[in-house]
Amino acid sequence: MGQLDGLVAVVTGGARGIGAGIASVMAEQGARVAILDLDGETAASTAAGLATPGLGMACDVILEEPLQAAVRQVVDQFGGLDIFVNNAGAGRMPLDPTITRPTGGGGRVEDMAPDSWDEQLAQNLRSTFLGTKVAVPYLKARGGGSIVNIASIAGLGASPTLPAYAAAKAGVISLSKSSALEYAPANIRVNAICPGFLWTRAWEGLATGMKMSVPQFADREPRDIFLEVVKNGVPLRREQTPEDIGHLAAFLSSPVGWNITGQAISVDGGITLR
């Protein structure tokens, strides 16, 4: 038996990366998982490969009506909702590690277009707000449940290379705490997870920029550059994986985690200890 047997979970942004890792672990623990993602084709493919019967569909989670319709479809098909994971989000790493070029969502505040700021807050904070808003009535109908919000260690401190992303993720952490207190009487637990260094498309872009602009990395592959950063920057000297995040999300959403709410837990190999 798994920790999540008989439960129904929704994972936003679950087609690949962290979201796919969360969906995979939750399915292995017995949950039926629905994946909502802008890339509906990949969402369906990922869902088809889960350990339990899954569902994958296209959905833009920063739009309330499509999100409402998608979650309603999940509830109609699976019979309810117990777990909602607000994972969808995006960060734009500045291509230049000296932080001298404007790069949309990354770089200096003075170089950032207001539209880029708004986009980052929509993708990372508005999406979490809407996911919570849509999920709560269904969780109440089940007598309680779990909301897990994927934040970032960038939201725990200063991130001069990613001001909009960091501000949005700090907002996710604050929203998680406020929601935890607000919905505790309804037996709904809300927690945030703050991942550290994972090999994602954002990190691949940053490592590619470092390869082009840092002489010592000129002959290195982006993946090797990332692992060098991990070696020098992570006390445990190892990268974090989507499955690492998935195991914590599953634990927080299981009966074992029934007394944990309003927390922001780092899965970062000790980065934030420094």
PLM features: residue spans?
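Canonical Rossmann dinucleotide-binding motif of NAD(H)/NADP(H)-dependent dehydrogenases/reductases
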Residues: Q3-V33, S179
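Substrate-binding pocket helix/loop in short-chain dehydrogenase/reductase
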Residues: L95-V109, A113-L121, V230
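Active-site helix of classical SDR
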Residues: T132, A168, S176
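Alpha-helical segment proximal to the catalytic Tyr-Lys
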Residues: P137, L181-E182, W258
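Short, small/polar-rich loop/turn modules that mediate ligand/substrate recognition or access, typified
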Residues: A184, R189, I260-G262
